[in-house]
Amino acid sequence: MAKVVKVSFGWRIPEFPVNGQPVGQEFITQVLKSLETVEGEFDSAWLSDHVIPWASWQNPSTDNLEGWSALNYFMGMFKRLSFGHVVLCNSFRNPGLLAKMAATLSVLSSGRFILGIGAGWKGDEYNSYGYDFEGFR
């Protein structure tokens, strides 16, 4: 007999308006309406961890949501979704502190936080906040 495997689907939360407008209440309302629509239909929702827009077509001075704070905000409102980042940049936060933050959020959300960590790749993003960027090795 074949083993049944559950497939999970996640929805990517935009962290900046694609029209270049500032992040404001109108944008947040659109995101909240989208999350209301996907809750119960998708298993998870995901945000990126960028301090400036990641998209090469987007003006780097475009306002965007900071991923950790925004994820905590949305997670508190939508109890039937798991949440995670695609992905957290390992050099934006001290590793020990990040582990504590992730463990705390996991406990507070009854295990709905999904931790994903990546290397970071956007040199101009590092430079804009004064972080060291050595590139890939």
Residue spans for each PLM region:
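Short, charge-rich binding segments
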Residues: 2, 73-81, 104-110
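Flexible, glycine-rich active-site loops centered on histidine and acidic residues
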Residues: 5-26, 92-137
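Glycine-rich, flexible loop/turn motifs
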Residues: 64, 77, 88, 122-129
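Structural motif corresponding to the early beta-alpha repeats
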Residues: 72, 76, 82-94
